[in-house]
Structures are given as C-alpha cells and as structure tokens.
C-alpha cells in the first residue's frame, strides 16, 4: 500500500509551521512521530496534500515543572506536544510528578512505537482507547493550541467530540499539555495510582482500560480520587462522579465494589467485532475495581507526608 502523492515541508520554527497550516488548511497534516498518520496514509484513509514535519521543533520538546510551589497551589507540569513517549516514560521528573502517566505509558503499543510516537500526537489522534488521552482527561489536563492568531486553551475533557474527532481546527497546532499536579497532600496522607487494560493481544488497542489516582489518610479514608475509563464510550471518560463517591469513605472492598458498580451505570458502550457491549461493561467493572485496589496498595506502601 502506498500513500497518494504529497508535498513535504519542514519548518524551522513553530511560527513557520502555523503559517503553513494557515496557508494549506485542511489539505495539510502535521507529522511528528507518524505512528498513527503514516499507516492511515498508507491505507489511503488520510490523503493530505501537504505533510508538515514538526518533529524537530525545539518549542515542542519541553518537560517542565515549577521549581517552587506556593502553599495554596498544586502547580502545573508542562509537557511539550512533540515529546516522544519513550522520553516521557524514562524521564525521572515526569515519573515522579506524573506517576499515573508513567504507568499508562507502559501499555502504549510496543517499545518500537513508543520510540516514535509523541505525547501530543496520541492526544490529537483522538482514538477512544488511547492511554495517554485517558490520563490527560482523568488528570484534567489543559491543552494549549496555537495558530497565526496566537494561543488558546481547551480542557482535555472538552477536547474530544466523537471517535477520532476533536475540537482542534485545521489551522491549529497542539503545543503544550498542562497537567495539574497533586503536590500539596495533607499531613500524614499518602497517594497511589494505577492503570490497567484488556486487549486481544499485547500492544493492541484496549478493549477497555481504566485508571485511578487516590489520596488516603492514615486510616485508609479517601481524601481525593480521580477515576477514568477508556474504550467503553465514544470518548475517553473521566468520571468525577466516582471520585466524589469515594471521598470520605474508607477505601475497602465494599467501597471499591460500590464504585465499580457505579462505573457501569455511567457508561453506554457499543459492541463491535472485538467485544460485545455487555463484555465491555463487564471489563469496565472488573478494571475499575482492579485499579482502585492497586492504587490503594500503592498508597499504603508510599511514604506518608509529615504533618
């Protein structure tokens, strides 16, 4: 299989890339890793007349957290859209600041695909089963988009409109992903997180995925929680309702079971040749329970924050 003929440009700056997008509009596609776009072009599912290579733009390569945080702020961790998934996976600052993303990245394809794929590319591609997109929604990340008119922001939870469809305009480029940090835990509390999924084969797109991040007090009561499900809806789903349900409760088997049952009531999956709707509901219940248990265990073995 071969793609249709196209023109190729490699802008030296982000401003040049935005100018090219403004000129060519829907006829142009950005390429950084090409992990998703190139196969689609080979199958002629995507037929861009122009391919704009942004893989070497330094403006898109940042991994940054504030050196000092005010007492009343959780802070923000900024990841450039062009950062390779393998770089993010190995970066010590990223692993310490965004442990949930570090766990999710292990499930993304294979080592070879993570060596090419970028954080921003996965988010913009819009696959409902994408691990990175799910974590961005669960952690309530903010996406910075840029065009010739300047920068704008959109919440990750509002970015996805339908399968493979996002709110980004043809002339816009995703530049940064801003993750709110859980940086100021209460005295004596601990935090934990987990990501899990089920697929037909290792490295395949998930039939259903789930993730959770929790903060527990010394007695095991939940102080804060975020939960999400992927692959069981037209969009990656953050479920703040589940977090609210867990806050104040002791995170024991009963509370986890109630949350897992509630998760099923919040989704309406569709069946396909890979899995029926009922099977996806079953997987959602199992995976939500599993990630909450694993996150609880992770928190229980973490070092408590001193009062």
Describe the function of each predicted region.
Residues 1-307:
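C-terminal structural segment of proteins
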């Amino acid at each position: 299989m071969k793609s249709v003929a196209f023109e190729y440009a490699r802008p030296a700056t982000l401003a040049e890339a935005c100018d090219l997008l403004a000129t060519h509009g829907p006829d142009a596609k950005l390429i950084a890793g090409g992990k998703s776009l190139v196969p689609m072009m080979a199958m002629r599912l995507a037929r861009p007349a122009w391919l704009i290579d942004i893989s070497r733009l330094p403006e898109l390569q940042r991994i940054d957290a504030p050196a000092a945080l005010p007492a009343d702020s959780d802070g923000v961790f900024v990841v450039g859209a062009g950062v390779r998934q393998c770089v993010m996976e190995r970066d010590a600052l990223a692993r310490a600041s965004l442990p949930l993303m570090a766990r999710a990245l292990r499930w993304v394809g294979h080592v070879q695909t993570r060596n090419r794929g970028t954080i921003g590319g996965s988010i913009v591609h819009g696959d409902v089963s994408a691990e990175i997109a799910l974590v961005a929604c669960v952690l309530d990340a903010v996406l910075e988009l840029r065009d010739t008119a300047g920068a704008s922001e959109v919440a990750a939870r509002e970015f996805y409109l339908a399968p493979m469809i996002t709110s980004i305009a043809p002339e816009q480029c995703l530049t940064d992903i801003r993750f709110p940090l859980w940086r100021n835990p209460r005295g004596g509390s601990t935090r934990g997180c987990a990501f899990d999924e089920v697929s037909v084969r290792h490295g395949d797109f998930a039939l259903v995925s789930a993730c959770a991040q929790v903060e527990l007090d010394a007695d095991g009561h939940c102080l804060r929680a975020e939960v999400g499900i992927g692959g069981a809806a037209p969009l990656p789903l953050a479920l703040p309702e589940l977090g609210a349900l867990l806050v104040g409760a002791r995170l024991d088997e009963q509370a986890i079971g109630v949350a897992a049952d509630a998760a099923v009531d919040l989704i309406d999956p569709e069946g396909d040749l890979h899995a029926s709707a009922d099977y996806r509901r079953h997987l959602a219940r199992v995976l939500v329970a599993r990630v909450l248990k694993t996150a609880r265990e992770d928190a229980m073995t973490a070092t408590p924050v001193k009062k």
